């Protein structure tokens, strides 16, 4: 950058450079007209002052049956994966992300000597995250604002009825409603004990099909084993009522 100074005193105080910098002084404008201007060039000054900018970006899941966090909050439903990034100036030699369960960071649970980290929060509670940067001799140190990550208590609710292929897009798939479920297994059976489907992702569901065809209306049964981010264990059993459709062109399985 170039800066014009009208009146130069004996001393000029400049802010410490954020990157290795060389200063060049040209003057004065009257001597320049006669071709007698003088130029003074400093040695390259190594950066000692530091600066950085940080961001935190959560990987959002578009699961309609998951109760997550608000758009402007971090955390919500576990597992929550968040990318913490720092953009640093040249003089930042020592870089560290800290994660703590203590708001005052009296105890630091995790340290990462990287500019960018991906961290997955899979236990219920509040976490505090900050970035610390310093120059080579630690004579200049700075900290970022603290990011708060709140992981909520677990929740698992199961519906007892749905109507596959009756009204596309509305109650046509059986899904649990959940929050902060970190382990999940679900089996669905017919009344004879035949397994209709098995899945291990709570965001998934059952479309009412068996071997590619819709099953007949009636009562089916689910068994669920799950674990929440708060350590709560779930063992659920119940019935699923498939409601009869008025459609006559259904491609159903026969018993």
Where are these regions (language model features)?
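Accessible peptide chain termini
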Residues: 1-2, 206
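Short, compositionally biased serine/threonine- and acidic-rich segments at solvent-exposed termini, linkers
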Residues: 2-161, 179, 249
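Short loop/turn motifs at secondary-structure boundaries
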Residues: 81-84, 147-255
